[in-house]
A protein has these predicted regions:
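Terminal-tail/helix-coil boundary detector
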Residues: 197-204
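Structured helix-beta-strand junction loops
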Residues: 48, 75, 148-149, 191
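Positions that flank functional sites
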Residues: 32-33, 185, 203
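Active-site-flanking alpha-helical
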Residues: 73, 166-167, 198
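GST-like domain detector, emphasizing the conserved glutathione-binding G-site
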Residues: 1-126
């Protein structure tokens, strides 16, 4: 398998899942600033020009966080990256979708690429503030769901990898994580696979 990623991005969550599952893969680092994701050879694999991408051994390219995480969990069930019981399993999927689609998609995108959310001459700072408010509110909602539990859906699952990269971003931009999210973030950072991934990606 070939894994296309950028250190410190949402692909960090997938990187964690690949390591947690003990899978063998070939990592390809894309420099987004240099436009590696827009080069013809990459667009031939992922026409959307986004990361992460996982090119499976059968030639199928998975080109978004949710599809990659779901495939890893379902293709390698012995790794127990999804709960077996219906209720916590649904919680894992719902939490992952909320983290990727709302916290990242609606919140952090406004913080990182505010120019995409307004016409020319728009108040960029106001858009960033709006993004921070979305992230803060969403993390409070997650905090209520965690209620002091170690992980989002019982044991470690794909939901925790999605939540972690958002917590990681919040930490990096100086946002204060609510108590249960902070405990989750610290617990995640203590996991061997997470420590390995952060070290490989140049973070401590």
């Amino acid at each position: 398998m070939k894994f296309y990623m950028t250190p410190g991005s949402c692909s960090t969550g997938i990187h964690i899942l690949l390591e947690e599952a003990g899978l063998v893969f070939e990592a390809h680092v894309l420099n987004l600033i240099k436009g590696d994701h827009l080069k013809p050879d990459y667009l031939a694999i992922n026409p959307n020009g986004t990361i992460p991408t996982l090119l499976r051994d059968d030639g199928v390219a998975l080109t978004d966080f949710v599809s990659i995480a779901t495939w890893i969990a379902e293709a390698f069930p012995r790794r127990k990256l999804l709960p077996e019981e219906p209720a916590p399993r649904e919680t894992a999927f719902a939490t992952m979708a909320f983290c990727v689609g709302h916290i990242h998609g609606e919140g952090f995108r406004r913080i990182f690429v505010p120019e995409r959310y307004g016409s020319k001459g728009a108040d960029i700072d106001a858009i960033k503030v709006e993004g921070r408010a979305i992230v803060a509110s969403a993390l409070l909602a997650i905090d209520c769901e965690l209620k002091g539990n170690d992980y989002a859906a019982g044991g470690f699952s794909i939901a925790d990898a999605a939540l972690f990269y958002n917590e990681f971003w919040a930490d990096k931009i100086g946002m204060v994580l609510p108590p249960s999210c902070l405990a989750h973030y610290q617990l995640m950072r203590s996991r061997p696979a997470v420590r390995q991934v952060l070290a490989e990606e140049g973070y401590r």
